[in-house]
Structures are given as structure tokens and as C-alpha cells.
């Protein structure tokens, strides 16, 4: 089966049964929270034999708890081929191509500035309560424990469409430049289950996150969600993801298409206004969603907002200069 621990951190920790052990897909933001999530699972299932850890993408809330999930000494040798890594009996760590490069770029090169700004965005230092910190739309908030990183032992590229991990087949879909520069969805045929990483989240996401990061490509984001729908929807019973809750059955197709549609709409409408000569601030004030998207509860503006996403698209194509020489 597939099990998720939600509410322990900003993201979910997902535990997937293999023939003789477990895959952990995303390991939360900090070591302590991941230890607690793993302990919850072990209280129910006994000691977990972790065959593989998968990082869905290069944001810290998905890899920072690595040392709470596994011991560094139990990690497979990255110099070995992937087949030999699995055969070694050690834990294999998988991530999308470019993961380490972008994890370092975001969390080392700009890490100090970004961490400071994240405190403002998420209200990390606020007291919990109705007049302080509640949640942040995609999860409970930013945790403040020990952030760790264990480098992937193998990065998934386009030349690796699928792997079998301890008897469980996993089919990958790379989605670079969407919610993160390096990201991947995954499909589990045995469970008829589609993992959408952070490409679908039960809320409108950020095309530009206010903590600071590279602007995301709304057009590609929509494209990859539609591709996932076309490749996997007809053989999927459940869609699950790294934030918020799963979706089942007949609602899956609509869920994927509505999520793709909102990013495509914001992208195209912003370009339309840009080419008419409006500035970034003017577009942010003008743009509005059609009723069909406005009324969809899982694409509401609980995390990202329409105005700052429109500004993100303007920035991506035209940059900060408003072309006013005065």
C-alpha cells in the first residue's frame, strides 16, 4: 500500500511498500520531523527496511529531513551502476536530473538571503494562534529543525523512463522548469497510483515565490500536467502529491486539467496584456479568473496569488524594466 504522514511539516512524507521493504518519497524539511514521521509508521508496521529514498524535486522541504529517514552509512555507493546499487542491499537515493545542482544553487548560493525572506513569507517567528501563525496553504508552515542533505546516488534522466525497486515498478515523468528547476512525477502500476510531486497541490501555487527563487514556467507547468493526464489518467485510481491530500477515481481527470488550466490561463492572459502595452503592476491589477476556474476550490489562492503570479510571467519574459525612460 501507499501511506502518507501529513501535518508533521510543510510537506508530506510518503511511504510506499515494495516486495520486501519501503520507498520513502520526500523526507520533509528537517531531521527531527522526519524522525517523528518514521516513528509513527514504525509504531504501526514495525522497523522499516528502506530500500530507496526518492526526492521529487530540489526544494528543501522535500530533502532536508534525509538523516531522519536513513543513516548515511546505509546509503549505496554512487560510483556503482544503479543495478549494483540495488543489489548491494544499501539504500538507493533517487532524484531528478539536475537535482543537486539546483539544490545547491537555491540553498547555498542564495541560501542566507532566501532563508531570511522565507521567515517573512511564512511568518516563521510568529506565535501559533489565530492572530499569529496558522498554516501556509500548502502545509503547516516552515519547520525550524536540523536541515540535512544526503546526495542522490543516482539521478533520473530522460533515458531512464522506469526502474524496478525491490520488485515494485516505478515509471518516471521528468518535469523540469515547473514548480522547481529539477522535478519529477512518478507512476506506480501495481497500485494504479500517480505521484504528482509539487506540480499539483490543492491550491494555486507560486510562479514566483516571495522568498525568492527562479521564476517558474507556467506554460511548461501546464504542459507537463496535461502530459501526465494523457499518459497515466486512464490507468490511475488515485493521484497523490507532496502537499495536501489525494484525489480519487472520476475526479482525477478534472483535477489535473483544472490545475493545468489555471497556469495556462495566467500565462496566456498576462502575455496578452503585455503585448497590449500594459506594465507589470497594471496587469496585476487587471487580471481575473473566469468563473469556471474561480469556483474550483483546489485552485484557490491559498498559497500563490493571481497578482504576483502575473508579475512573475511579466518578469520571466520582459524583466524588471518597465520601458519608461523617465
Question: Language-model features: where?
Answer:
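Active-site environment of divalent metal-dependent phosphoester hydrolases
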Residues: 58-64, 100-103, 179-181, 201-205, ...
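Divalent metal-coordination and catalytic microenvironments
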Residues: 1, 16, 26, 41, ...
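Metallo-beta-lactamase
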Residues: 87-90, 94, 98-176, 220-229
